[in-house]
Amino acid sequence: AAVDSVDPNVRIGICSCISVWDNDGVDSYTLAKLLAGGTKPLVRLIGAPYWAENRFLDNRLEDIIELERMERSWKDDKDDIEVFAEGDTYPRPRYRVPSSYLEIFDTALRADGHFDGILKYMRDYNASSAYEPEYLRRHAENKVYSEALSVDFGGKEAVGIRVYEALHKL
């Protein structure tokens, strides 16, 4: 890949968007493999807790959790790609997007057992670092539980009904 000609240690990750799964002609996993060069491909999926508060595409928190799980299910397990969830709480003050939404989202995806992590956006882009400490406080409070979930559920298979959604419908 071209990135290797600049620096073979540079790692490029892909942030998914909705259209990449259906009508862009290439999905995030394929793009990540193409751009990774000699490094491990990295994908941050799309679907964030702030969607629930804003009712983006009329989604509630449980819909967004299942959207990310569906996107993760499209990854071929033979592919060695690091996959992160989008833990965005834009625009970040708790009165807009409760910290509980971020923690519930993180908890559910850890219990899924197939994510390599979550990119938690816990700081406001423009405000003082003391402006909104609750996201970080809740994250720290839940650390022991998060670690236990990762150990207890990591690598296990979900059972039950799986609604099949085709990739690349257009």
Describe each region flagged by the PLM.
Residues R11-L170:
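Hydrophobic targeting/anchoring helices
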Residues A1:
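Active-site groove signature of glycoside hydrolases
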